[in-house]
C-alpha cells in the first residue's frame, strides 16, 4: 500500500517513492499573500489562522515549538482536501503538501523558508509478506 508520512509503522518495510514540501496555501487576496514575499517564515505564518490535516498537526506544532513560536491552529481537518477547500473559501491559510496545489486554481502557494517541512510518500508492506506485485515494482523502482 502507499502511505504518506508522518505515520507510525510497526512490522512494516517501506520504500520512499517521493518527497514533497508542505506549502502555505491561501487565496490571492488573503493578507499573507499580499506581502511582497515569495517565501514565508514560521513567525510570519504564526500571525494567521492555520488550517491543516490532522496528520500534520504534531509535525507542524513541533516546528513552531522548536523556534519558540506560538501558532493558531484554527481548524484541523480529517483530510487535506477539506483543508484546501476551507482555504479556498477564505477561512484561513492551509499548510499542505505541494501536490495539493494541482487540485485548484483558486489559491496561491508560498514556501516556508526557515524550516524543512517535508513529507514522503511510502510504499509499505508487512515484513513477513512481500506480495509478488510489490517485488516486481521494487525490481524496477
Predicted regions and their residues:
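Acidic, Gly/Pro-rich loop/turn segments at junctions of secondary structure
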Residues: 1-47, 98-107, 117
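Secondary-structure junction motif
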Residues: 3-4, 32-33, 38-40, 46-67, ...
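Hydrophobic acceptor-binding patch used for acceptor engagement in glycosyltransferases
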Residues: 23, 49-51, 92-94
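Residue-level recognition of the GNAT/N-acetyltransferase active site
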Residues: 27, 53, 126
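Short amphipathic alpha-helical segments
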Residues: 46-49, 71, 119-122
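Hydrophobic hinge/microswitch elements
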Residues: 56-108
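A late-sequence structural motif
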Residues: 109-141
Amino acid at each position: 500500500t502507499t502511505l504518506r508520512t508522518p505515520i507510525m509503522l510497526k512490522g512494516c518495510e517501506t520504500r520512499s517513492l517521493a518527497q514533497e514540501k508542505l506549502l502555505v496555501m491561501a487565496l490571492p487576496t488573503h493578507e499573507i499573500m499580499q506581502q511582497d514575499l515569495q517565501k514565508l517564515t514560521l513567525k510570519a505564518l504564526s500571525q494567521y489562522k492555520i488550517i491543516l490535516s490532522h496528520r500534520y498537526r504534531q509535525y507542524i506544532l513541533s516546528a513552531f515549538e522548536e523556534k519558540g513560536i506560538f501558532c493558531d491552529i484554527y481548524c484541523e481537518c480529517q483530510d487535506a482536501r477539506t483543508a484546501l477547500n476551507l482555504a479556498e473559501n477564505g477561512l484561513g491559510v492551509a499548510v499542505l503538501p505541494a501536490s495539493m496545489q494541482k487540485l485548484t486554481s483558486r489559491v496561491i502557494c508560498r514556501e516556508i523558508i526557515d524550516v524543512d517541512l517535508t513529507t514522503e510518500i511510502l510504499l509499505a508492506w508487512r515484513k513477513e509478506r512481500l506480495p509478488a506485485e510489490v517485488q516486481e515494482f521494487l525490481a524496477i523502482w
